[in-house]
Amino acid sequence: MNKLTERVLCVGVSGLILFSVAALVQGTKKCYANPVRNRAASRVKPYADSFKEFTNIDEARAWGDKQFAKYKLSSSEKNALTIYTRNAARINGPLRANQGNTNGLPADIRKEVEQIDKSFTKMQTPENIILFRGDDPGYLGPDFENTILNRDGTINKAVFEQVKLRFKGKDRKEYGYISTSLVNGSAFAGRPIITKFKVLDGSKAGYIEPISTFKGQLEVLLPRSSTYTISDMQIAPNNKQIIITALLKR
């Protein structure tokens, strides 16, 4: 029953995926030949380039819990990660302001950063995987944050074309840590920018849901000072979100 067979798999490549328990909405579909489990009813989608995307909460959580058990984090590392999830801006703000330089940071924040950095020596992805993040218009910077949305909340297409010219095909560096999720869930429904991170096998990334302050986010944390390449930018079918595809550099 679990043997792999070659058949055509249709996957959503530009649409928004939202869930409310079992609800699922997908956008435009495109078909690729891919090995998938015969009749296995798996809701993990292999893409043509072999990146895995979860669309089912329970399957995503089971996968994440399995990874977390492998990390063997110390109590100090767990505590620092929990503190981060409680108020990420408290740590990321100073890191961004200092372009990743920890010199001059308050002693307590510097200590937490050291422990979080240490945890990444134990946390990595066992396979290529898709992670999601939702952002507000401020992600696009002062040139676009106040003009990218029309009054009705839809994307201003003329401004979007300028955004693509500015960002598509370019690298972006984040001096703070990057909080992502295993699923594109309802928590992102109100965010106008959704980034789909392609994360390569062996990349530093940690599933920290079991020790997160706010449960249910299925959070995967990426290291500070990560760089990623924005390979594609599309407007979602509902015309209210920009879907960014980005490859995380190792």
Curated annotation (Swiss-Prot):
Keyword Transcription annotated: no
Marked site: Transition state stabilizer: 219
> Keywords assigned by UniProt?
Glycosyltransferase, NAD, Nucleotidyltransferase, Secreted, Signal, Transferase
UniProt-listed InterPro entries: ADP-ribosyltransferase, Mono-ADP_RibTrfase_C3/Edin
Q: Where are the transmembrane segments?
A: none
| Location (main, coarse) | secreted
UniProt-annotated location(s): Secreted
What chemistry does it catalyse, as a reaction equation?
A: L-asparaginyl-[protein] + NAD(+) = N(4)-(ADP-D-ribosyl)-L-asparaginyl-[protein] + nicotinamide + H(+)
* MF (Gene Ontology): NAD+-protein mono-ADP-ribosyltransferase activity; nucleotidyltransferase activity
Cystine crosslinks: none
Q: Which GO terms describe its cellular component?
A: extracellular region
Q: Which residues bind NAD(+)?
A: 85, 92, 96, 133-136, 172-174, 188-191, 217-219
Q: What is its EC number?
A: 2.4.2.-
Q: Where is the active site?
A: 133, 179, 219
Signal peptide location: 1-45
Domain TR mART core residues, every copy: 49-250
- What top-tier enzyme class does this entry carry? transferase
Relate the protein's function as given in its record. Answer: ADP-ribosylates eukaryotic Rho and Rac proteins on an asparagine residue.
Q: How does it assemble?
A: Monomer.
**Sequence similarity:** To C.botulinum D and C phages exoenzyme C3, and to S.aureus EdiN.
Instruction: Write the protein's name.
Output: Mono-ADP-ribosyltransferase C3
